Every structure is written in structure tokens, then in C-alpha cells.
Amino acid sequence: MFSQFFILNNKGETIIFKDYRFDISKDSNEIFFKHVQSMKSEITPAFNIDGINYLYIKKREMYFVFTTRLLVSPSLGFELLNRASKIIQDYTASLTEEAIRLNFILIYELLDELMDYGVPQSTGTETLKAFVFTPPKQIKSKQLESDSIIDNFLKATNKISVPPKQGVKPIHSGSKNSSSGGSSLSTNTVSKVVNNIVDSISGAATNLHNSTSGGGSGSGVTDADGDNEIYIDLCERLTVLYSSNGTILRNEITGKIQMKSYLRGNPALSLGLSPEFTFKTIANRDESNENEIDNNNIGGVSNLSAPSSNTTSFIVDDCSFHECAGSGFQPNNTINFKPPQGDFTLLKYRISNNNYTPFLVKTNLESTIRNRFDLVVTIRSNFSNKVVPNFIFVSIPVPKSTKSLTHSLDYGSQNQKVEYKQSTQAGNLVFWSIKKLRGGMETILRIQIHVDGATSSSSNNNQQQQQPQIDVGSTLRKEIGPIGLEFSIPQFSCSTLQIKFLKMLGSNISPIRWIRYITDSKSFVSRINN
């Protein structure tokens, strides 16, 4: 099926090269990189050169590539590339060039088990643990902290204290857990694992781990053992479009519950979500059952801020689950699942009927003086004053004929910075960065745009002054805007979705869990009255 798998950095240097079928020349990696560099923006993720098919994905400034002479489904190749990158991240703790080079022996061992003669075999982190025995080497903590976003997420709360290095560590660490199991696998256990491929990974992983460790669903989960913990991220991305008069034309939320599990024994867990949510995949629930949710089992959630609007319910347009939660939603918005070890997305959802935005944007563009435009941009934070965004970046396109530009800030100039950059890839842009804007606060940027008057002056020699001035002015106005916002708000859920509890089924022991919320912008655009 697949002949070669290799990883290149953004300079074209080979980090990993694995040849499965030996039917393609060894310089295929050089041919691939030369083609990518020559095509640049026109490159496609799948292409053919001299009868060789190349399929690749790019992650963390690295190229993950498959080559084959056969006609293989591209979607299959992309899925395997994504799974391979996920496995490498699970076993090396971070998907970086340095981590891969440091653990190249481990990665080659993983690739040997991943495919046999180019045919996919085992693509699950849990399943591969039975056959991989090389201990991972972890990058120094200082370097991990710079790559980790855990510390950025947790700066907004003073009750959760999670060192970043705990959230970035290899799954198969070879510590207390691996010394007792792994080497004492029975023949029956190994045969069960070998027979389970790609689509049945979760079940095989559960049987394997329970048989090797000999523990029940809640065995060994204690606060003293830091290896038994689970990290949960509730991430939401906003797509918002404001009209020139300030009304909302589009407001959509795309969210997911991302998990990273270090729990041993694959215990069955139950996750409870906010009862205010209505999912189209389940029937209407009796409101009297909402009081049955166990609010005392909230773990790792503190100071979570919700939108100030009193929204009673949200209708989720569509959602999808990970294979470990095959039964979907249970009564009272609970999800029962058995988490596999490593990174996985438990739930993805989309909300299109949202009527709340964390920022209110107003713009006003005037042209009172010839060859000058006055633009006023007002941004108001629409959330609790306890919430502080990590960053806010505002980009404002201006005409290409801009000769000079002046600006002034009404509030908080010490925490804000305005830069004007000419001849960027997107044209002339004004960048406005806001370091700190608490909830309920407002900031105003006033810009005076001075454009080159050569065009209008030459037109005035042949025609009356008024008509050319209107034409030129209307053309230049269309080159101003739209305004784009980029932001990230920690410990904030725009949809008010909250994780009410996370507990272990059939056991009184609660797993160690760390829950975080993050809301950021996918596309937040405001038009200008052109």
C-alpha cells in the first residue's frame, strides 16, 4: 500500500525516514521538498511525480509524508498521517523536531508496529504499548514550558495550580506502572491485540490493560499518584460578522471537549454537562431532573465566567462523539465513556443560533476634509470584569495610496500599541494590540488617514472639482476595512456550556482531573460604513 514514510522540517532536512516496500528511490524526500518549494501556494496535499504519489500533512513546521506507487485513497492516507503524528506526540510528549530527534529509536519502533510492509496494522496509543518497550526521553522542562499553552490557560484563575510539565509528558513513561506490567503479556493477550486493527482499538486496549495490570476500574487512582490524572479542555471558536451599523449578521460557535488521559486501567467515566443545553439528537428532558446533577463533584473548575446575558438554553445544531462514547448522550446531558490513553476529542459541537458576542464593535468612517479620512473604532468587552483576555489583536486595512497616518487612543494607552505597516502581503494595515481589557471596559481608537491626492488633482484639470472628488473618495472608502479581531479568553465559555462533574462509574473514587475553558476567535469581522 504505502512505500515510504518520512518527516522533514521546514528546511527540507530529513528527521525520520522509513522504507516499507523498497520500491521507490531513496531520494524521494528531496524530490518532494523541491516540488513543494517550487509550487509554494499552489501546492496540493496530494500530487504525482513520475508515477509516484505523494501525500502529506504539515504540523508544527514539519512535513509528514507518505509515498506510494499504488492508487490509494487520499483520505485514508491523510487519516493515517494524522494518527501517526498523534502517536508520536503521545509517546514523546510534544510534537517538535527536537523531541522527535531525541526519541528517534522509539519512533522507528513505533513505525515498525504501525504498518507491516506498508499495510496499516495498529494505530492506537494503547494497543502499541504492548509492543513498544523503548522508554521515551523528555525534553527539558524549560523548553516544554515555552511550547506549552497550559500556563497561559490557567493564569486567569488562582484556585487551579497545574505545573505545565504535568500536562506535557509521554504516555508510556516506563515508571512505576510500566515496571509491573508490559513484560508479562500472555500469548492469548497478544493474539487478541494483533487481531484488533484501527476500528477496534479501544476495546482491545481495555482488555489488554485490565489483564496486565490486574486492577479494577478504580484501582490505583489516588491523589498521591500523579500518573493517574486526566486533562480536559473545553475549547470554543467564534465566527462573528458585524454589519456596518453594528448589527450581527452571523454568529456561530464551534466547540470541542479535548481530553488527554493518563488514567490506568481504562476506567469507565461519566461526564455531566450543563442542563441548559438542548441537543437535537436526544428527546426533550423533564426540567425536574436537572436538580439531580451532582454539583459537588466539580473538579478543577473555579472562577468560570459565563456571558452576562441571561440565556436560558442553547440548541446545538450538530455534534459528534469519539468512538469511546458510542452511546452518545444519556439523560441529564451525561456522557458515559472509557477514555483511551493519550489525546482524543470526546465531543465536537456547533451552535448557529448564538446571540451573544464577547466583544461589541462599532465603527464610524467620515471624510470631512479632502484627501483625509477619519475612522473611529470602538471596542467594548461584553463579559464579567473578573475576566481578562490573554490578548486582543485588531487589524484594519487602509488604502494603498495612504501617504501618512496618525492615531490617538482615548483610554488605556499604556496597555495598548498601534502600528502602521505598509506593503504587507494583505496590503497596508494598521495593527492595534490590546494587552489588557477587563470585562465591561471600553476602548476607542481614532485614526486619521491621509491619502495621496495626485489622482484627484490630475482629474480636476479636465473636469469639475466635485464629481471626480466623489468618485475617488468612494473608491478609497472601499479600501478601508473590514476590521478583524483575534483574541483568546481563558476560563470563559461563550456558550455557557460547563462541565458539571466527572466521576468514575461503579466506584466512589474520583479521578484526578484538571478542567480548563478557552474561547478564541476563528473569524471575528466587522464591516465599515463604506
Swiss-Prot record:
Region Disordered: start-end pairs: 164-187
Main localisation: Golgi
Residues covered by the MHD domain: 227-527
GO biological process: Golgi to lysosome transport; intracellular protein transport; protein targeting
Superkingdom of origin: Eukaryota
Listed CDD domains: AP-4_Mu4_Cterm, AP4_Mu_N
Compositionally biased region (Low complexity): 173-186
Keyword annotations: Endosome, Golgi apparatus, Membrane, Protein transport, Transport
Function per UniProt: Probable component of an adaptor protein complex. Adaptor protein complexes are vesicle coat components involved both in vesicle formation and cargo selection. They control the vesicular transport of proteins in different trafficking pathways.
Entry's family note: Belongs to the adaptor complexes medium subunit family.
Name of this protein: AP-4 complex subunit mu
Taxonomic source organism: Dictyostelium discoideum (Social amoeba)
Lineage of origin: Eukaryota, Amoebozoa, Evosea, Eumycetozoa, Dictyostelia
